[in-house]
Amino acid sequence: MTEMTLSANAITEIEKELEKYPADRKESAVMAALRIVQDEFRWVSKEIMQEIADLLEMPAIHVYEVATFYSMYEHKDVGQHKICVCTNISCQLCGSKKVLDHLKEKTGVGPGETTPDGRITIKEVECLGACGGAPMMQVGREYYENLTTESIDRILEGLD
C-alpha cells in the first residue's frame, strides 16, 4: 500500500475552508478537511488525521474523535462506488432487505464488502433522512429512493 499524504490540492482546499472561520478557530474546519481528504483517497488514514491535526493546529485525538464518531468517514479503503443502503425502520419496513439481497445477487458482495475489482463497496447505514422515499440508498452523494429491483439495475448499469 502506498503512503497517504495530503496533496497540494487538498491543502489548498482546506486553506479555503479555513478562510470561513476566525483565525483562532481553525478546528472548525475539521469536518470539511476530512471530507476533502476522503474525496481524494476514498478513506481517511490515521496518518492523514495527524496531518489534518497539524494543519488545523489541534490535537490529533480530536480529529480522530470526529472521524470515528461520524459514519460518513471511512477508515479503510472502499470501492470506487460506495453504495450505502439505509436499513433503519422505515426502509426496513419497506424492503431494505430486498435491496441488499438484490445488490448481493448483482455484485457478488454483501454489506461491509468490496467487489474484487475494487469497483463497488456495499454498506448498511442508519437513517439517511429520506424516510418518505423508502427503501432508499445513497451512491456517492446521490440519493435514490423508492427502489425496485429494476431501478437498482439501472443505477448499477449507470456506474462508470
Residues covered by each model-derived region:
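Signature of N-terminal electron-transfer/Fe-S-associated modules in redox systems
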Residues: M1-D160
